[in-house]
Amino acid sequence: MIEDNSLGLEFKYLIVNDMDRKFGLWVNTVGYQSIPPDSPYPLKEHPSGYFFNAEKGRVLREYQLVYITKGRGLFSSDSTSEKQVCKGRLMVLFPGQWHTYRPLRQTGWTEYYIGFEGPMIDAIVDDAFLSQEQQILEIGLNEELVSLFSRALAVAEADKISAQQYLSGIVLHMIGMILSVSKNKVFEMSDVDQKIEQAKIIMNENVSGNVDPEELAMRLNISYSW
């Protein structure tokens, strides 16, 4: 587990054994990083298999879900022309597919991600529940999804017996939620609802620290009395 609160960085790369693979779905990595404006991207703390030059892109051997909760940036892949990604959007990455993404320097961004593979997810993709033709999904700000990423990080860090099976269940929960929310347009909340979700996410990210209510109100551009 690598954690650097000064950078807003936390991630875990997991060891997968033969028994984990028999389950049909396993997780290789899970993480969170907050990239301030005018910062290099990606951060160099990642292993060589994951670190990449955003100008050249990369090809992974796994699926990934990358959820943006703050800021904006750009994404492109073999099947997707360059598109803007902003808070509330989720990128789906596929194994063997070239892709690249990065935050805009003037905004930075906050991302949550989880990487996984296995025949279980292959079957889900083969049946077109997830598609390379639709790699950017509109989710909106969703505190429940952020909580699932946080739970996955906690499970990965504890690394107890059957942690991989626990993590696989979290991935399936995420996929089910993502499909439901994006297809039913549940993300189309009012501005007030979205600010409430954003406040929940900020408090979730600062669960071990103190969140000043007045400062939080200023960040959300609302009055403290509201």
Regions found by a protein language model. Give the residues of each.
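Amphipathic alpha-helical segments enriched in hydrophobic/aromatic residues interleaved with Lys/Arg
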Residues: 15, 123-185, 201
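Ligand-binding loop in jelly-roll beta-barrel domains
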Residues: 82, 96-119
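Short acidic-glycine-tyrosine-enriched beta hairpin
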Residues: 79-94
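Generic protein-terminus/edge-of-domain signal
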Residues: 1-83, 105
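Short, leucine-enriched amphipathic alpha-helices that occur as contiguous helical runs
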Residues: 62, 192, 196-200
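Basic/polar phosphate-binding segments, predominantly the helix-turn-helix DNA-binding elements
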Residues: 177, 198, 204, 209-226
